[in-house]
């Protein structure tokens, strides 16, 4: 190699190496999300829900996830098991492990829906407060918080259960400490059932009597929630038609179609072998690396 070219070679190498490093650093790892699935245990999981963060719609992912084969719903008052999802009616049913039923009653915690959540209580829910103090605000004669009509039959039915001994009452005790609660805030997002404030030992929720109003052992206990079903888009439909999962990515939580190989696209998975958010940079890096070696080889033999 000519001595006169040594400085030129040295300058070119110095100029090239930082550029090569920058190109390499700019290429992010291909985003892979292998956790999106269309089932969790025995429950089908469709949009807007997802099995993990990045799956489904971001407004729902902070409330619902799949954990060890169990689909869970989270609020500020706890984590609840989702027992069913009915997509045609846009409802989910959740089970509170501390909620009383006819067969088993116990002291319960409170229940609250987050105000910003896309969920509301369905109108067919009956919240029943059990073992309430005689000084409970639900018995305020100036505020109608208890259904004293058909609610009285529900209270008598609950107190006829053997499980009532779990909250310190005798079977068939007077239903004067029971209240079918009618929340003053209605059933919207932000619904709250604060048992300490209401001075009640336990609660239950009945979402279906199953045609057996006189037999509390056959009542369906749980909390039925209506969800906002207006999140579906044409992009999501195209994604699902191509076998992908609708999800989101990035700080702005923009739409992403997550293919079954774990890669993301901006629309669908037809013929997609690379992630739209990283492929071009990877190819660019490879080409620049090849060009750099060619430049170095040429200059060494000049």
For each predicted feature, which ranges?
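Extracellular/lumenal glycoprotein segments
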Residues: 3-302
